[in-house]
């Protein structure tokens, strides 16, 4: 059986790790907010920080337009087609490079699901709406969401 086709710009893990251990990695963050529900977060399924809540995001592929990367990540992480809106800002991740990992920089975009906001029942496993920022959320993302969107932390 042959391997599935890889997207343009795909790198084997060893090459990816080698490159991004030396240079910053451009990422996109998919921010979906609803006044009556809060922000949509997902549980990380890959290292680092497996099992923690985070803003859905991913690496921009070689020669991929940033807006297309946002749409691709939304489809992959959330199963949603989105319209890409305002650039909310960027998130640097010192927790990564301070721990000997890579050095990602995430461009955070407000997005709107095409066809309306999904209900909790329509979301894939590991996704949830939060009106307060949960414990265990990436610290850099917690600071960003609190500052940019005014979301309070969960008191628990």
Regions found by a protein language model. Name each.
Residues 108-110, 119-151:
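NUDIX/MutT-family hydrolases
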Residues 1-29:
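Acidic, metal-coordinating catalytic segment for phosphate/diphosphate chemistry
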Residues 24, 66, 141:
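Hydrophobic (often cysteine-bearing) scaffold residues that line and stabilize catalytic clefts
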Residues 38-77:
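Conserved Nudix-box catalytic region and its N-terminal flanking loop in Nudix hydrolases
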Residues 91-117:
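Active-site-adjacent beta-strand/loop module that shapes the phosphate/pyrophosphate-binding cleft
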Residues 81-90:
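A short coil-to-beta-strand element that immediately follows conserved catalytic motifs
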């Amino acid at each position: 059986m042959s391997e599935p086709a890889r997207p343009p710009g795909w790198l084997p893990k060893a090459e990816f790790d080698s490159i991004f251990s030396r240079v910053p990695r451009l990422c996109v963050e998919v921010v979906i907010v609803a006044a009556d529900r809060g922000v949509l977060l997902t549980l990380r399924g890959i290292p680092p920080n497996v099992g923690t809540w985070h803003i859905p995001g991913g690496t921009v592929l070689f020669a991929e337009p940033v807006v297309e990367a946002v749409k691709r990540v939304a489809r992959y992480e959330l199963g949603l087609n989105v319209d890409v809106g305002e650039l909310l800002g960027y998130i640097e991740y010192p927790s990564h490079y301070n721990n000997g990992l890579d050095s990602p920089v995430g461009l955070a975009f407000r997005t709107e699901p095409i066809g309306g906001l999904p209900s909790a029942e329509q979301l894939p496993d590991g996704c949830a709406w939060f009106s307060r920022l949960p414990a265990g959320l990436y610290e850099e993302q917690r600071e960003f969401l609190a500052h940019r969107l005014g979301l309070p932390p969960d008191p628990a």
